[in-house]
């Protein structure tokens, strides 16, 4: 399939699917090379703990996903292999990290600002029997 040549070993109907697979494998290879080009310690030093957790989880998920694909290519049903439970466990941790990230992004209440906003937003109608501004300083005694 390299160089766009047609191979007679498989039906023509699956040519597009095989080409897409080959392209995807190339993309995965490129990403892994990029990821492996920087030492893990060097990468993690630049990140805060939450980002470090994300990198570790994505790395573990990627590795286990690739093992899932490997098992499938070897004729082993990955759904019946312990790798399935491992992927589910990693997903649980990914969801926890996502919840933490979402909580950090959520709007926080500034009580002082909210109090000022409510106080200034309330409208008080003028009473009919209130003295004029000119009479404000004078008393009726």
Curated annotation (Swiss-Prot):
RNA-binding in keyword set: yes
InterPro entries assigned: Exosome-assoc_fac/DNA_repair, Sas10/Utp3/C1D
Region described as Required for transcriptional repression: 1-100
Secretion signal, residue range per the UniProt entry: none
Ranges where the record places region Interaction with NR1D1: 50-100
UniProt-recorded Gene Ontology molecular function terms: DNA binding; RNA binding
Domain of life per record: Eukaryota
Keywords recorded for this protein, A-Z: Apoptosis, Cytoplasm, DNA-binding, Isopeptide bond, Nucleus, Phosphoprotein, Repressor, RNA-binding, rRNA processing, Transcription, Transcription regulation, Ubl conjugation
Start and end residues of each stretch annotated as Interaction with NCOR1 and NCOR2: 100-141
Disulfide links within the chain: none
Keyword set includes S-adenosyl-L-methionine: no
Cross-link (Glycyl lysine isopeptide (Lys-Gly) (interchain with G-Cter in SUMO2)): 119, 126
Post-translational modification: Phosphorylated by PRKDC.
GO-annotated cellular components: cytoplasm; exosome (RNase complex); nucleolus
Locations listed in the record: Nucleus; Cytoplasm; Nucleus, Nucleolus
One annotated GO biological process: apoptotic process
PANTHER family: NUCLEAR NUCLEIC ACID-BINDING PROTEIN C1D, SUN-COR STEROID HORMONE RECEPTOR CO-REPRESSOR
Reported function: Plays a role in the recruitment of the RNA exosome complex to pre-rRNA to mediate the 3'-5' end processing of the 5.8S rRNA; this function may include MPHOSPH6. Can activate PRKDC not only in the presence of linear DNA but also in the presence of supercoiled DNA. Can induce apoptosis in a p53/TP53 dependent manner. May regulate the TRAX/TSN complex formation. Potentiates transcriptional repression by NR1D1 and THRB.
Binding partners and assembly: Monomer and homodimer. Interacts with NR1D1, THRA, THRB, NCOR1 and NCOR2. Associates with the RNA exosome complex. Interacts with EXOSC10; the interaction probably mediates the association with the nuclear form of the RNA exosome. The homodimeric form interacts with TSNAX following gamma-radiation. Interacts with RAC3. Associates with the RNA exosome complex.
Sequence similarity: Belongs to the C1D family.
Name by which UniProt lists this protein: Nuclear nucleic acid-binding protein C1D
Gene that encodes the chain: C1D
